[in-house]
């Protein structure tokens, strides 16, 4: 029996994780849940999974939750500190880190310092502070199992092979809803169009990141830290069918790939059951039914966010943290219909150009770069 705490339990990854857990009551229990936006959903989760402690976004939400639950309720915490408390709590063997954005960094680090193995769905944790996180994981003998489908595919394709035998990692990208949209048409893209991903069902923020290809850029940075691979050995190929989730090419010319239907429950099940496997509930892969698989190069001219991510990784220091923070602000502004689709990349680019990078050592120094970039990007959005 493995006990889990889930950070971001009411989001897309959290709901999918609980769906896998629901299928295997003999294999998984829930110690803690943390959520940010849906107290009503959290109430249902508490009644079904009976966690010992939970966290919500703020004091008002905590009071609302306590009122809804009545006398029989778990310990209730709130804010980033509350999520960190849930992450580090005794009783959990593994923490599923699925809070969206840089807000997941502090709770994930708390879990690592408490010696919890991590099922990592929050790629921003590695983007913002990859060196710090990997150093802490090594220090506390913590295993980080990626939940992103691409990194899960690479993780599985690397097992049993030597690091020095790897020629390169190949991340696949669906291309998003605008794969064949012209640069001129991209300037007129609506929010509703951008939220219609052709293959994956995800939250709003990651869906927009997929449309701009920033999601793939963030995944390149995450892969660098997870697999100790330099930027020039991490490639991206567009694969619209989203059946091959990523590949590893070895020095002998052999390529290992992981295939499956595009359903996040598969990499989630792999991560939370590791090193065993368990049924995930996804549709079975039927290659004759799919018929053919296609591939093409990404277009950096139409999708500059991918280029910006590579540039931030090459520059290092605080640049990836600034890239991520500026993107979070720009995407939020697009979701609020305050800026256009192509303004997202422009905001990120201008924020990065204004930044004087430095080498962070402490968590606070990483967070300071994050705060600076958010303020800069907010100013750019207001003037857009």
UniProtKB/Swiss-Prot annotation:
Any GO BP annotation:
isopentenyl diphosphate biosynthetic process, methylerythritol 4-phosphate pathway involved in terpenoid biosynthetic process
Q: Which GO terms describe its molecular function?
A: 1-deoxy-D-xylulose-5-phosphate reductoisomerase activity; manganese ion binding; NADPH binding
Q: According to the lineage, what is the superkingdom?
A: Bacteria
Q: Kindly list the positions annotated as binding 1-deoxy-D-xylulose 5-phosphate.
A: 123, 149-150, 174, 197, 210, 215-216, 219
| Binding, Mn(2+) | 148, 150, 219
Provide the binding site for NADPH. Answer: 10-13, 36, 122, 124, 203
Could you say which cofactors this protein requires? Mg(2+); Mn(2+)
One family from Pfam that matches here is: DXPR_C
**What is this enzyme's class at the first EC digit?**
oxidoreductase
Which pathway is this protein assigned to?
Isoprenoid biosynthesis; isopentenyl diphosphate biosynthesis via DXP pathway; isopentenyl diphosphate from 1-deoxy-D-xylulose 5-phosphate: step 1/6
SUPFAM superfamilies (UniProt xref) = 1-deoxy-D-xylulose-5-phosphate reductoisomerase, C-terminal domain, Glyceraldehyde-3-phosphate dehydrogenase-like, C-terminal domain, NAD(P)-binding Rossmann-fold domains
Keyword terms, alphabetized: Isoprene biosynthesis, Manganese, Metal-binding, NADP, Oxidoreductase
Catalysed reactions, as listed in the record = 2-C-methyl-D-erythritol 4-phosphate + NADP(+) = 1-deoxy-D-xylulose 5-phosphate + NADPH + H(+)
InterPro entries assigned to the protein according to its UniProt record, in alphabetical order? DXP_reductoisomerase (IPR003821), DXP_reductoisomerase_C (IPR013644), DXP_reductoisomerase_N (IPR013512), DXPR_C (IPR026877), DXPR_C_sf (IPR036169), NAD(P)-bd_dom_sf (IPR036291)
Sequence similarity: Belongs to the DXR family.
What is the protein's known function?
Catalyzes the NADPH-dependent rearrangement and reduction of 1-deoxy-D-xylulose-5-phosphate (DXP) to 2-C-methyl-D-erythritol 4-phosphate (MEP).
Protein name per its UniProtKB record: 1-deoxy-D-xylulose 5-phosphate reductoisomerase
Q: What is the lineage of its organism?
A: Bacteria, Pseudomonadati, Chlorobiota, Chlorobiia, Chlorobiales
